[in-house]
């Protein structure tokens, strides 16, 4: 098996004490090194999915690396104080779970190079019992916070974290979970990646008036807002959340895919990074072996012919979208505005 071309042994397993909200220079340096290492690894192994034509998601796991490596250091320092699981209500950010499984030794790093490949046991959402090291199952947005409330109730005296997103917080399940967490004073901490990006575009444009902080404050949660790329501010907010009993939401403002040329701030970062952009990123970071491996991947071909089917293939959501566009294209702009109402489920 080909060796994973980015040296994950360079990860620095530091410990952080939540009673001290100020990072030392050494701690800050180690965290920043871990963040860069993990982000580079996520770019590489998710891009193998793009190279094979099986898709995937890069931006979500890439974006949330800073909070994940901080939590990892906290879990290592005070394991009895936490439920040491990176619960994530955005199932498509599964790259986080796979990478952390590899770092803890549950999953061979080389297996990451088969991300979303058939029979690799690395599907597009985490599946408990399928992938070594994965500790929960998670589907589409909005279904994990209620589950995490239950985990917290089952572990009194411990702090439970749930990685969230501004997209997830639009879902009704999360509204119910927020009200229950406040009513029962559940010790759950939400760390929300607020990048103003979903697959449909920018919520600030297509859902004006929606605000994550105001929404959660309205449910009764204490809310801390900060810059997700400012490691000192992020760590202070996480420490404050830990040291304050009850439900708290930390909202991290950041653009989608910070630092990735061609993707930063774009909703295209939600999906898997394209091979050309991944190659450009990895070359700039000096990962020549990763570049060589990506260039060597051959997209599988299917030579079978199916009766009644053409040569064009597409996902259900794309086929549906193209069908709608073909119908609307026969109408004038005035007619479309007068007769057509679009109700978007955010899964087109």
What label would you give each PLM region?
Residues 1-161, 287-348:
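Thiamine diphosphate
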